[in-house]
């Protein structure tokens, strides 16, 4: 029992100790927890305080950075506004300078156009004066030759008359006595003085001699003309029937089509750089106006204009239009043009049957492809002249190859007459001498406009072929005003002669038909009148080919039967 109490007491003691230990442990733990919590709160407060301080410091740094950024942004805005103002001022200044440059360019273009017009007018005036002087010299040369021929005839006549003077001297005494008796008889019969009777007889004799002279001149002229015309017709007919060529010539075009009007802006380029580069590289004015789907190329040099046309067509087809591309296309087109010109010269030489030409002459021949005279292509004209000259030379038994060479080369000076001072004849002579052409070719070049002064027959053949090729209908064109003025001048020259009733220019100015008053002009005098009118036309006018003068004298007798 005691044991039980002891055990119970022990258990109670153990239980009490356990509970007491537990209570004390809880108290200690509570105390420790409170201490830990206070330390944790203190540490948290310290961390919070330190974090707040760091946050304030970071906030202040951020605010400082924001202020710095705002200040820098403000400074950048200020600088941007300042630069914008400067750019605006510079842009306005550039626009003003550009406007001034455009105005100066327009003035310069106008001045250049006026200068070109003045130079063209001066050149035409100089050329006209030179042609007039040349015609005057030719007329004086013909007059001198006529006087020389007349002097020879007079010398022969003088020799013949000297032989007759001796016989006439013997008859002089008899004639004097007979004349005295005739005068006395006339005085007795007609009641006239010897002086009056002599004057009447002389007037009658002059009229008879004038009539006889006109009849003889007419007969001799008709006989010589018929013979020469028969021979010339035979030779020329043989040449013409073996030659054929087109009647219209190809003209150099200066209008280039474009696909649409938007292409005009691309051709001009930004601030006009494309058109400036194009004009500077080609030497051709590019005119862009309101013409729909087309632009115009303007230049006095046909070769440069043709190069510019090829360049422009290539640029439009390619679509890449800028100064570098323009320069590439110009160089390419120039090389192609040189090859094309040389090929044209070789083709003309082969077509004409002329061999052995030097490359320089072939190149000059090719340049004539772009040269025209009164609308007629000079190269095709030269080829046709070569054919005609060769055919006529063959008919006359001359060297046909040399004749073709002279015909092909007769206008070689026209290939560069717009670049070198002088007439195409002078330039052609110098070129032929430089390239070592035969003397016959040089003589044909020098005298294909005045064959009567030539030293060989080839100059006459070339002049005839030149006239045939140039004067045939449709070969050349001329201005309407000049054509009408030429017809009026032909009629006025004919009407100015006494005895002319009316005159008409027909067949495009190649014939003048003159109606005369039959009571004032006899049949014999009509021949002399036609010759005088033709001489006046040759002296006072310029005309292609020949002008035929036809004098018509018509006598009518009217009576009424009643």
From Swiss-Prot:
Single GO MF annotation: RNA endonuclease activity
GO cellular component: plasma membrane
Transmembrane segments: 1-21
InterPro entries found in the cross-reference section: HD/PDEase_dom, HD_domain, HDIG_dom, KH_dom, KH_dom_type_1, KH_dom_type_1_sf, Ribonuclease_Y, RNase_Y_N
Its EC number(s): 3.1.-.-
CDD domains per UniProt: HDc (cd00077), KH-I_RNaseY (cd22431)
Domain of life, source organism: Bacteria
Main location: membrane
Biological processes per GO annotation: mRNA catabolic process
Family affiliation: Belongs to the RNase Y family.
Name under which the protein is recorded: Ribonuclease Y
Organism: Deinococcus geothermalis (strain DSM 11300 / CIP 105573 / AG-3a)
């Amino acid at each position: 029992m005691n044991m039980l109490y002891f055990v119970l007491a022990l258990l109670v003691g153990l239980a009490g100790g356990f509970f007491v230990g537990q209570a004390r442990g809880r108290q200690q733990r509570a105390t420790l927890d409170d201490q830990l919590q206070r330390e944790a709160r203190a540490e948290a407060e310290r961390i919070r305080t330190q974090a707040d301080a760091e946050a304030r410091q970071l906030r202040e740094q951020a605010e400082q950075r924001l202020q710095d950024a705002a200040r820098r942004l403000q400074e950048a805005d200020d600088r941007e506004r300042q630069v914008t103002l400067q750019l605006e001022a510079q842009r306005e200044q550039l626009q003003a300078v550009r406007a001034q440059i455009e105005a100066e360019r327009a003035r310069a273009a106008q001045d250049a156009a006026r200068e070109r017009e003045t130079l063209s007018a001066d050149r035409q005036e100089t050329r006209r004066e030179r042609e007039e002087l040349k015609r005057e010299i030719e007329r004086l040369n013909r007059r001198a030759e006529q006087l020389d021929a007349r002097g020879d005839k007079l010398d022969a006549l003088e020799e013949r008359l000297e032989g007759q003077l001796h016989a006439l001297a013997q008859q002089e005494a008899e004639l004097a006595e007979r004349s005295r008796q005739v005068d006395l008889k006339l005085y007795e019969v007609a009641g006239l003085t010897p002086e009056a009777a002599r004057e009447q007889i002389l007037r009658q004799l002059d009229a008879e001699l004038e009539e006889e002279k006109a009849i003889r001149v007419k007969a001799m002229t008709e006989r010589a003309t018929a013979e020469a015309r028969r021979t010339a017709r035979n030779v020329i007919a043989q040449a013409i029937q073996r030659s054929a060529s087109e009647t219209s010539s190809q003209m150099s075009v200066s209008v280039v089509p474009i696909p649409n009007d938007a292409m005009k802006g691309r051709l001009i380029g930004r601030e006009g750089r494309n058109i400036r580069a194009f004009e500077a590289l080609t030497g051709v004015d590019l005119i862009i106006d309101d013409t729909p789907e087309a632009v115009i190329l303007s230049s006095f040099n046909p070769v440069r204009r043709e190069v510019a046309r090829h360049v422009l067509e290539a640029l439009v087809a390619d679509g890449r239009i800028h100064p570098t591309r323009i320069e590439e296309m110009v160089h390419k087109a120039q090389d192609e043009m040189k090859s094309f010109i040389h090929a044209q010269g070789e083709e003309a030489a082969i077509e004409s049957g002329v061999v052995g030409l030097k490359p320089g002459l072939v190149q000059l021949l090719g340049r004539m492809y772009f040269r025209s005279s009164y609308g007629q292509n000079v190269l095709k004209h030269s080829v046709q002249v070569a054919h005609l000259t060769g055919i006529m030379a063959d008919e006359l038994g001359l060297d046909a190859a040399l004749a073709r060479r002279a015909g092909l080369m007769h206008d070689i000076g026209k290939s560069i007459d717009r670049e070198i001072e002088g007439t195409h004849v002078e330039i052609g002579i110098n070129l032929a001498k430089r390239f070592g052409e035969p003397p016959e070719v040089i003589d044909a070049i020098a005298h294909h406009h005045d064959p009567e002064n030539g030293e060989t027959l080839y100059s006459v053949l070339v002049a005839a072929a030149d006239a045939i090729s140039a004067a045939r209908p449709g070969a050349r064109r001329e201005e309407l005003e000049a054509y009408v003025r030429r017809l009026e001048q032909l009629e006025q020259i004919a009407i100015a002669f006494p005895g002319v009733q009316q005159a008409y220019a027909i067949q495009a100015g190649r014939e003048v038909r003159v109606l005369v008053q039959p009571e004032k002009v006899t049949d014999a005098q009509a021949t002399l009148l036609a010759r005088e009118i033709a001489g006046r036309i040759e002296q006072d006018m310029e005309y292609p080919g020949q002008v035929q003068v036809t004098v018509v004298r018509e006598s009518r007798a009217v009576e009424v039967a009643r």
